[in-house]
Design a protein with these regions (language model features):
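Short gly/ser/thr-rich secondary-structure transition/capping motifs
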Residues: 7-15, 73-77, 132-134
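Alpha-helical membrane-targeting segments
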Residues: 1-11, 59-70, 139-145
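Catalytic core of membrane glycerolipid acyltransferases/transacylases, capturing the structured
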Residues: 20-81
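A residue-level signal for beta-strand positions that form part of recognition/binding surfaces
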Residues: 11, 25, 48, 147-149
Length: 190
């Protein structure tokens, strides 16, 4: 149903679908400018994605119901739940800005996605979503039809040098590289 709505109402366009790993599970990481973003990822990627949402959203009754239907997980103990999913060969979707951008710009990324990648050895698939801010900006109540594009980059493996402690420098470097890839896709051609 999500795919049908995405393709008809939003004229969803997907670039780089061939970059989705076929032989391993993965962590999708994307910018976050609208509440539509997780739905776009779930509609566009033909594999099941378990997205992580802010725990506060579960306080809104209709949102809690919707998050339950889409099998979205609350944040908080993200790494524990996400590690469990990844070790069970499930795919995880994260929006590491920590919330929806109120002005549509790309904010700094938190390190959780890099930590997951380093802990599990799974690749991060950077994505850039364009058009959702215009379709449903922060504070809007109902989406308007707009062209939405999901750009998918090649998987990135974040490897640590030693099998001991994951150092802060690995996390910072890893998430910096992922954010730069998302930024590059967002602003390509502008």
């Amino acid at each position: 149903m999500l795919r049908a709505i995405g393709r008809v109402y939003f004229r969803l366009k997907v670039e780089g679908l061939e970059n989705i790993p076929q032989k391993t599970n993965f962590i999708i990481v994307s910018n976050h400018v609208s509440f539509l973003d997780p739905l776009v990822v779930m509609a566009a990627v033909p594999k099941k994605i378990y997205c992580i949402a802010l725990r506060d959203l579960y306080r809104i009754i209709w949102m809690k119901w919707f998050l339950f239907l889409t099998e979205t997980l609350p944040s908080g103990s993200v790494s524990e739940k996400a590690v469990r999913l990844l070790t069970r060969n499930k795919n995880v979707g994260l929006f590491p800005e920590g919330g929806v951008s109120r002005d549509g710009t790309l904010n700094e990324f938190r390190r959780g996605a890099a930590l997951l990648a380093l802990k599990t050895g799974r690749p991060i698939v950077p994505c850039a979503i364009l058009g959702t801010f215009e379709a449903l900006p922060f504070g809007a109540r109902f989406p308007t039809p707009r062209r939405i594009t999901l750009k998918i980059a090649k998987p990135m493996y974040l490897l640590k040098e030693f099998d001991t402690v994951i150092e802060d420098t690995y996390l910072q470097d890893g998430i910096f590289r992922v954010r730069n890839k998302v930024k590059e896709m967002l602003y390509a051609g502008k």
